[in-house]
Design a protein with these regions (language model features):
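Binding-cleft/active-site segments that stabilize strongly anionic ligands or cofactors
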Residues: 37-90, 137-142, 154-216
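Short hydrophobic segments within beta-strands
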Residues: 6, 23, 146, 203-204
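Extracytoplasmic substrate-binding proteins
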Residues: 81-150
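Short secondary-structure boundary/hinge segments and terminal tails
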Residues: 30-32, 79, 99-100, 124, ...
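Extracytoplasmic/secreted envelope proteins and their assembly/folding machinery
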Residues: 7-10, 14, 58, 76-79, ...
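A short, structured surface patch at a secondary-structure boundary
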Residues: 6-60
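Solvent-exposed loop/turn segments at secondary-structure junctions
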Residues: 9-11, 26-29, 68, 75-77, ...
Length: 216
């Protein structure tokens, strides 16, 4: 099938054995590029926007002549227009459990076996990595991950990379972490960051922002 994915789940579709022709899995800092970890996976796909945007280039979607279009509820207002181009599936992305998105997509595309195989391999890898990290850095060592953009700091608390760190790898969440209840990452100030007592930090940002933070 010729699949256009605007939902941000092009990586999941690749797990299920599909190569999308159009995607919105673009880099959060530069919508014209793929995230580095998806460059090979999405090679050849046309970037149509960013998955957290509620509108995309309708004409560009049409020119790809898709058989199926996948969107999330973020792009709900585009649904009627897109259905005139090709059958359109609208999904609700799970905010706090990315594995549920895999199960959901697998059910829609009838690829549950592929999903289970991938998740089983992932869990085995996560368990081994968890033990390796704890052996090297200690089982009580805490970790913070946040994204710095536009002078704001978005903390991965209970979803995304935070879910991987604290649930999949079983690493320690530092004291002072903000709570997260939906897809929006909690935003903190410089002072808020200082209140989070972490032993190690994973920083996601641009080179320019990193230099600014290091000089502060």
């Amino acid at each position: 099938k010729r699949i256009v994915d605007l939902s941000g789940n092009s990586d999941i579709l690749s797990i299920l054995g599909y190569q999308v022709i159009g995607t919105a899995n673009s880099d959060a800092y530069d919508y014209t590029k793929f995230p580095s970890y998806l460059k090979d996976t999405l090679k050849g796909a046309k970037i149509l926007g960013y998955s957290m945007q509620d509108t995309m280039d309708i004409e560009a979607v049409m020119n790809l002549e898709p058989d199926v279009i996948v969107i999330s509820t973020v792009q709900e207002k585009m649904y009627e227009q897109l259905t005139k181009i090709a059958p359109t599936i609208m999904i609700q992305n799970e905010a706090l459990d990315w594995k549920e998105n895999i199960h959901h997509m697998a059910e829609i595309f009838q690829r549950t076996k592929q999903a289970e195989t991938w998740l089983s391999a992932y869990e085995t890898k996560a368990e081994k990595l968890s033990q390796s990290i704890k052996n090297k850095y200690g089982k009580d060592t805490s970790y913070l991950s946040f994204l710095a953009s536009g002078g704001q700091f978005f903390v991965f608390s209970d979803a995304g990379f935070g879910d991987v760190l604290y649930n999949d790898l079983g690493l320690v969440k530092p004291k002072g972490m903000p709570k997260q209840s939906d897809i929006s990452l909690p935003v903190v100030t410089y002072e808020g960051l200082a209140e989070i007592d972490a032993d190690y930090i994973f920083l996601i940002t641009t080179d320019e922002m990193q230099k600014e933070l290091e000089s502060n």
